[in-house]
Amino acid sequence: MKIVDLAAMEYAEAFALQERLAADVAAGRAEETLLLLEHPPVYTLGRRGDGGSLPDPSVRPVEINRGGDVTWHGPGQLVGYPILDLGCRGRDLHRYLRFLEQVLMDAAASLGVQAWRVAGRTGIWTEGGKLASIGVGVRRWVTMHGFALNICNDLAPFSRIHPCGIVGCPVTTLSREAGRAITVAEAKAAVAAPFAGLPADALPEQPRDAVQPSSCDDVHAPSTTSRRPPCPLTV
């Protein structure tokens, strides 16, 4: 698999590149590719979004063909677009989403931050809030779009939306959770490694103990701490 570091790129340009690569991978003209980059500030709205997650009427998101609701991209946030052929990996979109979550949890752990899944949600969380968002699209079983991992970005833009359609859910960054400055370059290295070693015909099995129960009222890790859980699951 090819890992391509694009540094910074406008959203429309990156989307056009994804479309070209996805078509080429589906036709056997190109190898699978992971695009890693940052975007200038932009809001995007996936297929699940209906405007209810946009309490600020001045927000004008780019409507795109990925799953999920509304989110924000900007400097200091690592965006990853894997262009993968799921046709030779079991055609299991659910397993692919869990694979992306595991990659991000492992990357966060390597940088000193514990993160976890929440049943019924897609993405990863910490005690401080949502750390990464995931939204994908598939054409001819080739993936597009992917994940956005908050590293050291400004969190103020998230206050103008209900991130991923979740009302009242705080958003956090790796740097905030680690209590130190983490760079996008550090995160790129941690995220890229699992893709570089990905088998051509399978997705790894995912552990089951990283998922918190869907019946919980909050997305927080089990612990003895008395801190107030940060993120009510209200939609």
Curated annotation (Swiss-Prot):
Disulfide bonds: none annotated. The active site is at C164. Coiled coil: none annotated. It comes from Geobacter sulfurreducens (strain ATCC 51573 / DSM 12127 / PCA). This is Octanoyltransferase. The record marks K130 as: Lowers pKa of active site Cys. One of its GO terms (molecular function) is lipoyl(octanoyl) transferase activity. Pfam families: LplA-B_cat. It is found in: Cytoplasm. InterPro entries: aa-tRNA-synth_II/BPL/LPL, BPL_LPL_catalytic, Octanoyltransferase, Octanoyltransferase_CS. Signal peptide: none annotated. In the reaction, the free carboxyl group of octanoic acid is attached via an amide linkage to the epsilon-amino group of a specific lysine residue of lipoyl domains of lipoate-dependent enzymes. Substrate binds at R66, G67, G68, D69, V70, T71, W72, H73, S133, I134, G135, G146, F147, A148.
